[in-house]
């Protein structure tokens, strides 16, 4: 079959079609060829069908790019085990295949599939499952191979008789090899079970006489745990428990003849090395005995008693504690009298306990002995009086007294209450009430710190009322609020009230005077109110009104107002007549303007419009309608002036929440110049809600369409699609679509399109897992500008490995991306760690931090820190910091190296190496950039030598050599000093002759002009010396008094020449203990001092050395400007458990100091802290610290004095359930701050977080909680400093309503809706709240015929003058008893609320009342009339009451 078409048109020049097919029983095929201009399409298909094998193929050739050659094949062959089912698809160069094979035989089954595709990760995937039940061992094997990665699970086992053997092999850590074995021997009545995995094993064995459990784990604290229970006799047992080296044994033996038990316990725990208990109980005599010992401290308890109608029990407790050597206790309980008494006392102290309760009250007494002062508490409480006293040694409550008295007389009631703390009265209350005299008096005083508060209330009938609230604070003085009311005349019928109100809390203080005059004696009631808020400002209100008692549906009133500024509404009058609800009239006059209204006025409907005689005055609408007939509703409300009215209407059919057809509108008073009108219709079919509608607002109009809303309540998910068109600029076409899923996740996807501008919200928190997760949230809103129009946040973590962890957070803002990644790997004991932090920020740039350290061996420890930052300008900032420490018995090395690309400091190195064998050698120094300072020091038995190199001009190299011989009678010191080509030498000799005489000689040569040559020699005898002195060309000979001191290791010579300036030569040398390493405290090892003619030079070497510490300090000063001071200090503890190290170097004004601290802590922990400061840089000291204590990790970082932060963290359950720790910030006064964070997963889709922070300052605490589930988020923060704060984001949908909320503290965005659809009641409630401003629309109508009806339409808004509008009513008529209540709320300040209430009994009488409340002014008509009808007449009384002091009573017959 073929078809050809040729035309002259370019669009369709040629069209040809040809088709052929073959149709046989075994094979069917068809081919279709289409030619369109120069494009050719070929489609072919074949089909082979049979009961055991079939094959379907389809092939297409098209000119479309990407689909030029397509092939599809689907086949099955139940006789082909390798390809039971096969599907192959190829599109151009892309091929997909899926092949399923397998077979089932007796006790053998195999299933497998292969998948090939061009998709990444699935190019080649194979799955094989095999079950073999043919042998005694049953086997199950499952394997999955993807991209060459093979994961296999093998299960094998056997179950023969009463024996089970199960084996499992998996690729999962902890379950690589898993075995379970169980055996049950019924004849021996025994059971044995065993379970093993890669890291541990557990076994359980038991029979009727014993039960044994044994477990081995890889954990250090529970390497081996076992317990065993054995029955040793009738009623006798032995139990033993062990954990590593800790154990406990329990034995209990029963004496059948005496019905008693003996109990023995022995154990060994850390802290309780020996614990033993022995006990006995005799059930017949009600006697008990218990003896125990902890670390040889024995405690014994014995007791006996009787149980009848009364319970008596006595007990004696003997303890090793001083104040409780022997304690005797007695318990008595009388059930009939409901009385109980417990009393205990000690023979060795004042300890006493009494607790007694009976019908008359409660009595308690407690004395807790203490060497400083006992603590004593006494309590006596009855209904009419009570007293509580406490005395203690604690400052906050050294003396406490609370006492009360109550007197309940027939006509008079009095009460008083007082509380005193530490001798100061903090609370006092007096109350008195006298009913016959109509007197009430209340006085309350409170004292808190220096604040005194007084509350006073006093009333005497209608003649006097006083109220006072006063507060006295020394800082602010006295402030009070006071009201004084004085009455006169025959109140409440006729009289006056004078009112004075004072308020000094406000600034300035304010006094208000008011007078109220009432006359209720005449037919026309009069009320006059005069108010003076301040001097010369008087407001007067005169009200006269009358209402016909026989026809209360009509009446009139007159109100005259006098104000200081003569307002136009000084005179107000009016009348009303609502006898005929369908033709009601209301008239009232304000000033010269009269308003009239006429129309229908009922609770269900009103057509009233208030119009004025003044053409310029606006009409006022008082219109409403509330009608309902089945599913049809007609609600309308229109209130307010013509230019500012509010409107709400809703008409249509509401079958249920899923089937609605309505039209409505609303206008929010003056805030909306036009009415917003709308129509809406939606319905539900097959679980999908669809709808449409229109809207109009002024010149704007449009339509909308709900394409679908499909919700799955069980899975807590839904999808929706909505669109709208309008003539609003930039919003001609708007569409919203998306879905949400809260089933074990938080997934929200919303797309909003407005005239081609697309906004998107994509939140995917589906991976809530404590060990690993990856969650994303994306928001795309073009209105936010190019920077934030698209925001995407991804947070992930991996804590699945016990030692290797990572955290990642990525944030994308528009085209920029910021992230932070942290990874670390550490040892089990945290002795070693490698980690890095990588981050990118649009504000800080890119930075990378690498940290590595090894503290496993403090004798060979090192740490490295690498820092690299690229700023937003492209500049790179980087540095490396390395620290090493090595030590042996006779050698110590410390080195710290700093390298950076900083211009101020590119390189720095500080080091100190020491050898302390027979000769002590020290090599230390400091390098920075191209400058170096080094010191080589050698200490021998009689010699000290050193070389100092510096970068300072003139001091490039300094060499010093000191030789001492200070033993014997002849002493000498030789010193040489060389700085460049400048040399100085010093020789001193001293000879002693006996104890009182001797000679000395000193020679000094220097390159300094002031002392190129110095020679001193002399002889002394009995502290008198003859001296020869020569300095350069100055020569002197003199006699004088000499002060000479000499010992085995030192000498000190000083004398005063005629010039008066002292000359002193001193030297000391004692280094043997230092070389031997036997010192234990700092001492002077060597010194040399020289003073002459006001010049001085001092040198000293201090130190000591032993196996635990090396301390060396060199200190030199001179009066010469070139070398004022040199200081070097090395202090290093060699103890590997705890050590402090210090390195200090000072050369004139140059300083460099390093302080290190290291200590071992409990549970194989440690802490290391280093502080570095130098004049090389203006930066303050740098402080770095890290450590571990058990599971707690500690980090310190800071700069300068007290400008450091120490932070520690301790994981809970390997950080799976939370963490805790401490924080020290001394710079702001917070030390020892403790925090605790708990997070848990109560359900699959619940996350709960709780944070507690103890500021360790006057008990201040901070608490915060966070809860996430499928309905939203709740969070709370409580702090004495920050206050209480809360955050809420919730939503809930139910068949009868919905709720949504987003809130922070008192600021809320809320929307709540409810639907009531019952047989007799229908209603709708919509509630909204925006930042504390509440909106509410509440409607309800319920009818049960003439017996009962109720209805309401209430509108709450935050708008001024329209806070509450609408009304409500209830009506009931049962057995001729009528109860009715109605309220009307108007948008008016003069008449905001009108309330009416009726309660009548019409059963052969008219008994009840009718109440009308207009703006707080209440009118009540009470009647009590007896009779059967109006024609026969009624007998009784009518009374009329108002809130104005008046009453009218009419009695008689009618």
Swiss-Prot record:
Carbohydrate attachment residues: 33, 55, 185, 571, 592, 825, 882, 1153
Places the protein is found: Secreted
Residues that make up the propeptide removed upon maturation: 1-197
Tissues and organs where the protein is expressed, per its UniProt entry: Expressed in the hepatopancreas and secreted into the hemolymph. Expressed at lower levels in muscle, pleopod and gill tissue.
Principal localisation: secreted
Keyword Glycosyltransferase found: no
Record has Transport as a keyword: yes
GO cellular component terms given for this protein: extracellular region
Keywords: Glycoprotein, Immunity, Innate immunity, Lipid transport, Secreted, Transport
A GO BP annotation: innate immune response
An example molecular function term from Gene Ontology annotations: pattern recognition receptor activity
Functional note: Involved in the recognition of invading microorganisms. Binds specifically to beta-1,3-glucan and activates the prophenoloxidase cascade.
Family the UniProt entry places it in: Belongs to the glycosyl hydrolase 16 family.
Subunit relationships: Monomer.
Name of the protein this chain belongs to: Beta-1,3-glucan-binding protein
Lineage: Eukaryota, Metazoa, Ecdysozoa, Arthropoda, Crustacea
């Amino acid at each position: 079959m073929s078809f050809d078409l040729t035309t002259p048109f370019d669009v369709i020049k040629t069209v040809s079609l040809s088709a052929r097919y073959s149709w046989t029983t075994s094979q069917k095929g068809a081919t279709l060829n289409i030619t369109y201009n120069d494009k050719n399409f070929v489609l072919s298909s074949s089909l082979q069908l049979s009961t055991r094998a079939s094959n379907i193929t389809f092939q297409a050739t098209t000119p479309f790019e990407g689909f030029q050659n397509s092939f599809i094949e689907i086949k099955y062959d139940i006789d082909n085990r390798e390809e039971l089912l096969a599907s192959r698809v190829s599109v151009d160069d892309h091929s997909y295949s899926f092949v399923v094979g397998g077979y089932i035989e007796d006790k053998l089954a195999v299933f497998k599939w292969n998948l090939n595709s061009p998709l990444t990760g699935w190019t080649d995937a194979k799955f094989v499952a095999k079950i073999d039940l043919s042998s005694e061992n049953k086997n199950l094997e499952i394997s999955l191979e993807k991209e060459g990665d093979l994961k296999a699970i093998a299960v094998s086992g056997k179950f023969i008789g009463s024996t089970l053997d199960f084996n499992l092999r998996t690729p999962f850590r902890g379950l690589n090899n898993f075995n379970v074995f169980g055996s049950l021997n019924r004849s021996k009545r025994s059971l044995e079970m065993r379970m093993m995995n890669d890291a541990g094993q557990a076994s359980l064995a038991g029979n009727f006489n014993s039960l044994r459990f044994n477990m081995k784990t890889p954990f250090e604290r529970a390497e081996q745990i076992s317990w065993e229970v054995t029955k040793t006799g009738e009623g006798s047992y032995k139990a033993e428990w062990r954990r590593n080296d800790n154990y406990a044994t329990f034995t209990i033996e029963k004496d059948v003849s005496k019905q008693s038990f003996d109990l023995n316990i022995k154990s060994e725990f850390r802290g309780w090395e020996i614990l033993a208990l022995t006990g006995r109980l005799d059930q017949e005599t009600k006697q008990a005995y218990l003896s125990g010992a902890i670390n040889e401290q024995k405690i014994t308890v014995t007791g006996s008693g009787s149980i009848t109608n009364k319970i008596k029990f006595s007990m004696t407790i003997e303890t090793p504690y001083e104040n409780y050597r022997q304690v005797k206790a007695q318990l008595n309980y009388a059930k009939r009298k409901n009385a109980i008494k417990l009393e205990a006392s000690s023979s060795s102290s004042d300890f006493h306990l009494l607790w007694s309760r009976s019908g008359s009250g409660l009595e308690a007494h407690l004395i807790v002995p203490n060497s400083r002062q006992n603590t004593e508490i006494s309590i006596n409480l009855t209904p009419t009086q009570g007293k509580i006293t406490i005395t203690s040694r604690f400052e906050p409550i050294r003396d406490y007294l609370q006492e009360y008295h109550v007197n309940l007389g027939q006509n008079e009631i009095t009460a008083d209450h007082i509380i005193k703390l530490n001798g100061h009265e903090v609370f006092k209350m007096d109350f008195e009430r006298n009913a016959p005299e109509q007197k009430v008096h209340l006085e309350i005083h409170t004292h808190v710190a220096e604040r005194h508060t007084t509350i006073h209330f006093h009333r005497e009938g209608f003649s006097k009322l006083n109220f006072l609230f006063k507060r006295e604070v020394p800082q602010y003085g006295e402030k009070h609020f006071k009201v004084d009311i004085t009455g006169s005349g025959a109140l409440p019928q006729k009289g006056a009230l004078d009112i004075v109100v004072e308020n000094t809390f406000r600034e300035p203080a304010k006094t208000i005077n008011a007078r109220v005059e009432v006359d209720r004696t005449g037919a026309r009631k009069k009320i006059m109110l005069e108010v003076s808020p301040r001097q010369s400002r008087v407001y007067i209100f005169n009200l006269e009104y009358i209402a016909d008692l026989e026809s209360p549906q009509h009446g009139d009133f007159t109100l005259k107002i006098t104000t200081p500024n003569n307002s136009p509404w000084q005179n107000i009058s009016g009348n009303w007549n609502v006898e005929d609800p369908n033709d009601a009239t209301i008239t009232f006059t304000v000033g010269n303007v009269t308003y009239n209204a006429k129309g229908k006025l009922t609770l269900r409907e009103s057509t009233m419009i208030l119009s004025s005689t003044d053409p310029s005055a606006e009409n006022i609408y008082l219109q409403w309608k509330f009608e309902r007939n089945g599913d049809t509703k007609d609600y309308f409300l229109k209130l307010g002036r013509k230019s500012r009215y509010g409107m709400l209407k809703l008409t249509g059919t509401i079958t249920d929440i899923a089937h609605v057809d309505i039209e409505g509108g609303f206008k929010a008073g003056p805030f909306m110049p036009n009415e917003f009108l709308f129509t809406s219709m939606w319905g539900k079919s097959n679980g999908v809600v669809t709808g449409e509608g229109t809207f109009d607002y002024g010149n704007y109009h449009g339509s909308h369409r709900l394409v679908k809303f499909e919700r799955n309540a069980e899975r807590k998910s839904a999808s929706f699609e909505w669109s709208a068109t309008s003539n609003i600029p930039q919003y001609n076409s708007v569409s919203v679509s998306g879905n949400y899923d809260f089933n074990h996740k938080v997934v929200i996807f919303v797309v909003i399109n407005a005239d081609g501008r697309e906004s998107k919200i994509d939140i995917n928190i589906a991976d809530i897992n404590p060990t690993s997760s990856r969650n994303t949230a994306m928001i795309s809103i073009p209105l936010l500008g190019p920077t934030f129009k698209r925001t995407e946040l991804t947070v992930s973590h991996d804590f699945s490995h016990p030692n290797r962890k990572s955290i990642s957070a990525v944030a994308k803002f528009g085209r920029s991306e910021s992230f932070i990644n942290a990874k670390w790997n550490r040892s089990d004991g945290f002795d070693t760690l490698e980690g890095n932090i990588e981050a990118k920020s649009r504000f800080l740039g890119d930075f990378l931090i690498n940290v590595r350290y090894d503290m496993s061996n403090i004798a060979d420890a090192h740490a490295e820190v690498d820092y690299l930052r690229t700023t937003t300008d492209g500049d790179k900032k980087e540095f490396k910091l390395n620290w090493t420490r090595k030590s042996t018995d006779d050698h110590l090395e410390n080195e710290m190296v700093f390298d950076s690309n900083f211009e101020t400091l590119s390189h720095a190195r500080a080091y100190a190496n020491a050898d302390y064998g027979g000769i002590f050698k020290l090599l230390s120094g400091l390098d920075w950039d191209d400058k170096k300072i080094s010191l080589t020091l050698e200490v021998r038995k009689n010699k000290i030598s050193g070389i100092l190199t510096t970068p300072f001009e003139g001091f490039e190299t300094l060499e010093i050599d000191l030789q001492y011989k200070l033993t014997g009678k002849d002493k000498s010191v030789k010193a040489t000093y060389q700085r460049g080509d400048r040399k100085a030498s010093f020789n001193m000799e001293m000879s002693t002759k006996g104890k009182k005489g001797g000679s000395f000689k000193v020679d000094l040569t220097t390159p300094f002009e002031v002392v190129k040559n110095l020679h001193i020699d002399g002889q002394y005898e009995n502290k008198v010396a003859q001296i020869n002195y020569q300095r350069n060309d100055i020569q002197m000979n003199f006699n004088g008094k000499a002060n000479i001191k000499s010992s085995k290791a030192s000498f000190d010579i000083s004398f005063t020449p005629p010039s008066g300036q002292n000359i002193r030569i001193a030297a000391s040398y004692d280094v043997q203990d230092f070389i031997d390493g036997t010192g234990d405290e700092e001492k002077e090892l060597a010194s040399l001092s020289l003073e002459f003619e006001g010049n001085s030079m001092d040198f000293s070497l201090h130190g000591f050395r032993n196996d635990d510490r090396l301390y060396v300090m060199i200190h030199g000063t001179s009066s010469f400007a070139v070398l004022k001071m040199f200081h070097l200090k090395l202090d290093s503890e060699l103890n590997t458990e705890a050590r402090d190290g210090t390195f200090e170097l000072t050369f004139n004004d140059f300083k460099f100091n390093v302080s290190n601290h290291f200590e071992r802590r409990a549970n194989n922990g440690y802490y290391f802290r280093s502080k570095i400061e130098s004049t090389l840089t203006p930066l303050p000291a740098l402080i770095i610290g890290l450590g571990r204590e058990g599971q707690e990790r500690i980090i310190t970082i800071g700069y300068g004095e007290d400008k450091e932060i120490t932070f520690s963290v301790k994981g809970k359950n390997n950080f799976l359930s939370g963490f805790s720790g401490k924080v020290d910030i001394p710079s702001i006064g917070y030390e020892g701050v403790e925090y605790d964070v708990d997070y848990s997963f109560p359900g699959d889709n619940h996350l709960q977080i709780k944070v507690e922070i103890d500021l360790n300052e006057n008990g201040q605490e901070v608490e915060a909680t966070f809860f996430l589930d499928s309905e939203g988020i709740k969070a709370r923060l409580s702090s004495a400093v920050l206050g209480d704060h809360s955050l809420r984001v919730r939503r809930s949908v139910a068949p009868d309503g919905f709720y949504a909320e987003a809130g922070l503290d008192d600021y809320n965005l809320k929307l709540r809706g409810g639907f009531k659809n019952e047989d007799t009641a229908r209603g709708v409630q919509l509630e909204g709240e925006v930042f504390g401003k509440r909106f509410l629309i509440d409607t309800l109508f319920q009818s049960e015929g003439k017996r009962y009806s109720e209805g309401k339409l209430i509108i709450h808004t935050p708008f001024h003058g329209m806070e509450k509008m609408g009304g409500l009513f209830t009506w009931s008529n049962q057995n001729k008893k009528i109860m009715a209540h109605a309220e009307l709320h108007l948008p008016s300040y003069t008449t905001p609320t009108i309330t009416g209430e009726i309660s009548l009994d019409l059963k052969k009488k008219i008994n009840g009342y009718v109440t009308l409340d207009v703006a707080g002014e209440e009118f009540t008509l009470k009647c009590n009339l007896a009779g059967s009808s109006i024609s026969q007449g009624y007998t009784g009384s009518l009374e009329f009451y108002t809130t104005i002091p008046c009453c009218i009573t009419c009695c008689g017959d009618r």
